């Protein structure tokens, strides 16, 4: 596809999102790209800045074209939060302390470290995009550090225990909700992976699932429990080919929360179903490597959290003291 000639107005005022939007930014003459980026930063044009940021992520981030869908979906929220907080700030020449003040403001609001980190990551992506467009040479978040959360990882998001999982399944009158719970609690799938699961990636003969929308853009194969297989076999096929009707992770979370309320279970979020899978697998196998393989952890330290949650032996020992 040829480059877009200098001075073209075909892409003004908005370039759009996705791979086509990214390609439009890349093909644009550098003088036009710089002009559009500078105007968008000056006017705090959210749509154009989000389009520019996504174009940089899809083109120049480490993941490139395989960048995770979750990253693409989460960054706009962080960019919008920055623009709202910096309503009076010059984006092209921000104050030397503006980034640090932004972090301190989020701390005072009581936001968790993970939330702050996500917003800073989005802000850094925005400024990398602006530097790529030669709209600004500033890198205000280069030396900004996210405060360390002293809470141990195993205390942050505890898993649903076996009784709670059973209660959720008993309350799932909708077969799609039942499959959703089992994909998380047995398969260890994340919310985004559940909603992107397609029937072509379900192999009943081999009893496995191919997960293509995985974190970090990795494709992985997950073993299918007998319960998951049985639930899938009784599921009606949808015209679009997707296993579940929920199209966004947020919708999947909402269904799990509603199930928790119906079952009288304290809601811990969708991701805690994945933690349940890891905790149960480690409890029944005692094998960290097998647990890590099922959840596709690249570091065993991540999997060790499940050993912390499975404190049955510790409790039994203490009970004899």
Predicted regions, residues:
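N-terminal core-binding DNA-recognition domain of tyrosine recombinases/integrases
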Residues: 54-70, 76-155, 235
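DNA breakage-rejoining catalytic core of tyrosine-based enzymes
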Residues: 136-138, 150-167, 216-226, 238-243
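Basic, Lys/Arg- and aromatic-enriched nucleic-acid-binding interface segment
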Residues: 148, 152-153, 162-191, 195
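C-terminal catalytic core of tyrosine-transesterase DNA break-rejoin enzymes
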Residues: 182, 186, 276-298, 305, ...
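Conserved tyrosine-mediated DNA breakage-rejoining catalytic core shared by Y-recombinases
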Residues: 187, 196-231, 301
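Catalytic-site neighborhood detector that most strongly recognizes the C-terminal catalytic loop/helix
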Residues: 213-216, 295-320
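Active-site/catalytic core of tyrosine-dependent DNA strand-transfer enzymes
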Residues: 225-266
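Short basic/aromatic active-site micro-motif
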Residues: 249, 266-285
